[in-house]
Swiss-Prot record:
SUPFAM superfamilies: Flavoproteins. One of its GO terms (molecular function) is oxidoreductase activity, acting on NAD(P)H as acceptor. The keyword Flavoprotein applies. Homodimer. Binds 1 FMN per subunit. FMN binds at S10. The gene is azoR1. GO terms for biological process: catabolic process; response to toxic substance. PANTHER family: FMN-DEPENDENT NADH-AZOREDUCTASE 1 (PTHR43741), FMN-DEPENDENT NADH:QUINONE OXIDOREDUCTASE (PTHR43741:SF4). Its EC number is 1.6.5.-, 1.7.1.17. This is FMN-dependent NADH:quinone oxidoreductase 1. Belongs to the azoreductase type 1 family. It catalyses: 2 a quinone + NADH + H(+) = 2 a 1,4-benzosemiquinone + NAD(+); N,N-dimethyl-1,4-phenylenediamine + anthranilate + 2 NAD(+) = 2-(4-dimethylaminophenyl)diazenylbenzoate + 2 NADH + 2 H(+). It holds the Pfam family Flavodoxin_2.
Length: 208
């Protein structure tokens, strides 16, 4: 039995947002094909996540060094540790996220800030940083209304590229992606584009 963490980063409904459609399609198909796995859902918009700042940075550093912390530092470090430990414990992780203003939603970036911890998800060596999450399987479900996979907009795509870069830095190699794009740019083809992507998500979930 595997523990699978589903991370949802849009608070839009399935009727409003395609990344939520992707999330729900993948989740349902995964549960159907893996009834014995432990599925943990994390809706980032319901978590009230504080931004990474001084107290969290200092607190997590001091905790790692065994140094005395202020009460605010303890509180902030405990918040980051909660999500980091949950992520590390999971055998598989599924991220569903839209492209908003060329990048990921702020809640997802904040969550990733919590996870990027030297000594846990990566380590420093004399040869440079080395990722420590090589045994984790990850799926990225991304939706963007325009076309960013090619052409002049490709250089502006900083959602999927951001997640791939971070996960690669952490050593994740077993990485799978499903992208739905262009449905807003071509409204006459939107239904076909979305349905094709949802089927890809279901197919991936069946073997993930």
């Amino acid at each position: 039995m595997s523990t699978v963490l589903f991370v949802k980063s849009s608070d839009r409904t399935a009727e409003e947002g395609v990344s939520t459609k992707l999330y729900e399609a993948f989740l349902a198909a995964y549960k159907e094909n893996n009834p014995n796995d432990e599925v943990v859902e994390l809706d980032l918009h319901k978590e009230n996540l504080p931004y990474l700042g001084r107290d969290m940075i200092n607190g997590t550093f001091k905790a790692g060094q065994g140094m005395e912390m202020t009460e605010d530092e303890k509180k902030q470090a405990a918040i980051a540790d909660k999500y980091l430990n949950q992520f590390v414990k999971a055998d598989k992780v599924v991220f569903a996220f839209p492209l908003w203003n060329f990048t990921v939603p702020a809640v997802l970036h904040t969550y990733v800030d919590y996870l990027s911890r030297a000594g846990v998800t990566f380590k420093y060596t004399q040869e440079g940083p080395v990722g420590l999450m090589g045994g984790k399987k990850v799926a990225l479900l991304n939706a963007r209304g325009g076309v960013y996979s090619e052409g002049p907009m490709a250089a502006l795509e900083m959602s999927l590229n951001f997640m791939k870069t971070v996960l690669g830095f952490w050593g994740v190699q077993d990485l799978h992606t499903v992208v739905i794009e262009g449905h807003n740019a071509a409204p006459d083809q939107a239904q076909e584009i979305v349905e094709k992507g949802l089927q890809e998500a279901k197919d991936l979930a069946a073997k993930f």
